[in-house]
Amino acid sequence: MKEEETTYHVPVLLKESVDAMNISPDGTYVDVTFGGGGHSREILSRLGDGGRLLGFDQDEDAERNIVNDPHFTFVRSNFRYLHNFLRYHDIGEVDAILADLGVSSHHFDDSERGFSFRFDGKLDMRMNKRAGITAADVVNTYEEERLADIFYLYGELKNSRKLASVIVKARTGQKIETIGEFLEIIKPLFGREREKKELAKIFQALRIEVNQEMEALKEMLMAATEALKPGGRLVVITYHSLEDRMVKNIMKTGNVEGKTTQDFFGNLQTPFRLVNNKVIVPDEDEITRNPRSRSAKLRIAEKK
């Protein structure tokens, strides 16, 4: 494993996820979350002369990890545009699509990116540094009710309305620009025993809103459903309940809402067959080596 790969992000469930893709040497594959390139390198190691891999990442920092391989094409884009770029590269159907939905260690460990409450720095949280609103924009400009909804829906925080009220009151005196300033405002709401867990939920909610993660995931999953050929695999690693619910729904019902449809005879209509009825999780050895993998869940579905 290359040094830049391990410092940028340690690939989670590497063997399990790539095995699940059922790689054929001459197949066409997509890694929609390239990141440190760990999964992509493993996929490429299994391809032959006719094989092809597209790797997506919207973060310009990921470009430092680009694989020098004639079978690999890097796409600097949000994976929500999967359909567009498959057409652009003249790819009809693909054999498997892999998505590791975890935030790269690089993002959490880079204080300038603003993803972690462990460091002071700007309230940013953008995956794509060239576009979109920042976390500071959210906490300084959103109406109180909208802020509360974000914390409730994306962070599953029970005190979301109190949290939003405190933030709105604080920003009337001075704009909230740094993580340190933000923590001073919200930390008094939590006891020491709950502090880390609650802060993690708050930062997750802001990150999801800033990057429109749920909307992007929905669009990618729908595009993946269309792009896979019969027998093709959708392989997804999730880390929190919101994204896991969406992935589980599309694999079971063919839509992210989980609405079931039946044919004339009452049989469930779905584009997928579940490969693993029980989620695959990291073993104790992997969690020891990479504690950030502890919440990972691997789901696999095969296109009918």
Curated annotation (Swiss-Prot):
One of its GO terms (cellular component) is cytoplasm. GO terms for molecular function: rRNA (cytosine-N4-)-methyltransferase activity. The keyword Methyltransferase applies. It holds the Pfam family Methyltransf_5. Keywords: Cytoplasm, Methyltransferase, rRNA processing, S-adenosyl-L-methionine, Transferase. S-adenosyl-L-methionine binds at G37, G38, H39, D57, F79, D100, H107. It is found in: Cytoplasm. SUPFAM superfamilies: Putative methyltransferase TM0872, insert domain, S-adenosyl-L-methionine-dependent methyltransferases. It is an enzyme of class 2 (transferase). One of its GO terms (biological process) is rRNA base methylation. The keyword Transferase applies. Its EC number is 2.1.1.199. Gene3D superfamilies: Putative methyltransferase TM0872, insert domain, Vaccinia Virus protein VP39. It catalyses: cytidine(1402) in 16S rRNA + S-adenosyl-L-methionine = N(4)-methylcytidine(1402) in 16S rRNA + S-adenosyl-L-homocysteine + H(+). InterPro entries: RsmH, SAM-dep_MeTrfase_MraW_recog, SAM-dependent_MTases_sf. NCBIfam families: 16S rRNA (cytosine(1402)-N(4))-methyltransferase RsmH. Specifically methylates the N4 position of cytidine in position 1402 (C1402) of 16S rRNA. Belongs to the methyltransferase superfamily. RsmH family. This is Ribosomal RNA small subunit methyltransferase H. It comes from Bacteroides fragilis (strain ATCC 25285 / DSM 2151 / CCUG 4856 / JCM 11019 / LMG 10263 / NCTC 9343 / Onslow / VPI 2553 / EN-2). The lineage of its organism: Bacteria, Pseudomonadati, Bacteroidota, Bacteroidia, Bacteroidales. The gene is rsmH.
